[in-house]
């Protein structure tokens, strides 16, 4: 089978459509699935010896949240090492990273797999993976044809990364190179709230402004602080953490500003405080609302004048510290109640950030669940950890009062429970492995199934045919909307409809 000029032109056109890179990437792999008639495809970005999914088609949504470290995925490592098309035989002993991650076929393993490494010059920047349930699914395509696909995808990804780098340098003063290399924090989520938060982090990171990060307990405020620091010019210097809620009043001033020998009973030597440790770097004050009014006054002086005094010392020390503060309280209300200084609040909240609760982040819960599943898989040495459809449905309908932290603990607990009740190193998380209170799931729609005098295959096809007809009618004959309603891939739906005689 050969690609026509029209097919290649169509792929190139799809890469130019859409507003953002994410939209273009999604269009690319959706088009590839239709052209190559594969069951699943993914575009991955390579960074720090791991592949990060940018867009997927035909795979479970939680794949977007997973991070595929080369050490734990030998097929992806083989793709990263190769300089050309990689075809894995159907009987390959190397586990496929997407086994169990094709919706509706969690118990089946992928049989055909092709990997296309993507390069910018001599540098590996990503990969395209194509998967199928039939062993010979990609035999009709030559390596040369697949190289053309890889070249188009590599060009699109390279341009996107270049634009991202240029935008980052435009926001940052001076040369961005020294601190770009230390970026490690991963903010997982594609919801509007998280997308906006990521943009605001990029903007404020370039400055030296103090930042007040507000959000409920467990939303990831510390992660936001790390992301700000790692994207800032101060990233080559330390990020120092202090939990104000766990700070006894008797030692709080010493922890912040340090002390000299003999300043109080037990002060047997000079000791630097957190501000000194963070000099030329960043100090993250978690739960800032727990500080006493007396300490708030001393903190305000540091923010105003940039000098500190160790406990027991008359001399002042100059420090250059950026302060990031976090709270789960409404500090405006605390100011009105007289429990927080208004002048300190205004000093800290030069650029306020709000971290949305998990219940307002939509499908991000599934992406995060995928990330935690992959973390558990690596930690416990499992070959795969998969979320069943029932588990995904449960996670999407629970409101998570403990936010991301509660989700993380729930996934870890569920993996341990599922592992205990299943032999082998493959774990499928079911709804019963989670212990959420008072979760109300939408009732399944009742459907009258007529008794028919047919064999099993004919009865199954009749049911599929009627189900698709009803879904099309409800969605005004929009095939994409119909596929979403039936929770299947639109390309697979088209093929099934043709086989059932619903399409020419």
From Swiss-Prot:
Sigma-54 factor interaction domain ranges (all copies): 187-416
InterPro entries registered for this protein in UniProt: AAA+_ATPase, GAF, GAF-like_dom_sf, Homeodomain-like_sf, NorR, P-loop_NTPase, Sigma_54_int, Sigma_54_int_dom_ATP-bd_1
HAMAP family, sorted: NorR
GO biological process annotation, one example: phosphorelay signal transduction system
Binding site for ATP: 215-222, 278-287
Lineage: superkingdom: Bacteria
Function: Required for the expression of anaerobic nitric oxide (NO) reductase, acts as a transcriptional activator for at least the norVW operon. Activation also requires sigma-54.
PROSITE patterns tied to this protein: SIGMA54_INTERACT_1, SIGMA54_INTERACT_2, SIGMA54_INTERACT_3, SIGMA54_INTERACT_4
CDD domains per record: AAA
Keyword field: ATP-binding, DNA-binding, Nucleotide-binding, Phosphoprotein, Transcription, Transcription regulation
Molecular functions per Gene Ontology: ATP binding; ATP hydrolysis activity; DNA binding; DNA-binding transcription factor activity
Positions where 4-aspartylphosphate occurs in the chain: 57
DNA-binding annotation, residue ranges on this chain: 479-498
Source organism per UniProt: Escherichia coli O17:K52:H18 (strain UMN026 / ExPEC)
Pathway(s) this gene product operates in, as recorded in its UniProt entry: Nitrogen metabolism; nitric oxide reduction
Pfam families: GAF, Sigma54_activat
Protein name: Anaerobic nitric oxide reductase transcription regulator NorR
